Amino acid sequence: MKTEIDSRIGKLQGKLKEQEIEAAIITQSVDLFYFTGSCQKGHLIIPAEGEACYLVSKSFERAKKETPLTSVEYQQSFRQLPTKVQETAGDVKKLGLELDVLPAALYFRYQEAFGGAEIIDISPLIKELRMYKSPYEIEIIRKGAEISHRMLEAVPRFLKAGRREVEFAADLEHLARTLGHQGGVRMRQYNQEVFYGHIMSGENITFSSFFDGPTGGPGLSPAYPQGPGWKIIEQGDVVLVDYVTVYNGYCVDCTRVFCLGTPPQALKKAHQDALYIHEEVIKAAKPGTLCSELSNMAFKMAAELGYGENFMGYGTDKAGFIGHGVGLELDELPVITAKQHFPMAEGMVFALEPKILLKGTAIAGVENTVYFNGNNLEKITIHPEEIISV
């Protein structure tokens, strides 16, 4: 773990030097974990050169046990911070902060404390670093995929007509926890959140919501308007299981489609077409292939197959992507969309989910967490992809 943490800090320091930023202060819990191995509350001061210092306000004793960093100090007051930054990085003319997640009130506080320094947004640097997973991270993600597979294997035990969606979901959630799923699923975007994921049946599958994805679901109330609801699952219903498993912090996103009985012919055809698009995107991903090229290809194929209106959603609720990066957060880089032009490169991990919605009834397609190994995309999630009749 020490080698991993040192490598991450070293890479960020290289980027700080390139932009002539003397120091960065990391405060967001996921970024703290990435650079220290601990989520304990505090400030990680990373100078462009030299040793990083983890200033911890709570829990100091736990942080000392969790992090391999040698410079870990107790922060009794915010007033210590400017002095510690000076000791760690010298005179700071440019100070890097995670402006994509930092509350405005805290930004003004840092601005006042470091009045002589220009504040620079280092969020893009951090997100791009985290986009490329190391072999250490890939192995953790593979273990998360095993949890996902075992959870999906258990679906036929729990999926019964007459049960409510939320009851079925709770059984899968209980199993996932006992297999090692940490429970919490972290997202970085403002006001984006998810609890395990989306399990919906019948007409609820195409019930849209604020969630930035092709599906939403009613949830239990408008207070949390996504995911499984109170609907009773009926014989003949198509059931979507789109759940995230998180092992040692790392997300795996996987979707499979189930049916209580025989799937309708229209769904079978749409599912085969969605799988075809899925496989063609995987084949097309080579070193240097742009995210935008993969996205444009998928949307073009869907339109040619007759799904232009219902690929990745309907109307204004349509998702503009076919995949999203996964790691310590569910919404990482790269995003497989026409607007992003990152080239495929070793270490990229993302959830690939070209889906076709059949309004009011069902959804076709799967979601796999995939890894670009330097030559091509390989699937990390391993569960069978056909519609599973129960």
Regions found by a protein language model. Give the residues of each.
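Active-site neighborhoods and metal-handling regions in enzymes and metal-associated proteins
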Residues: M1-V390
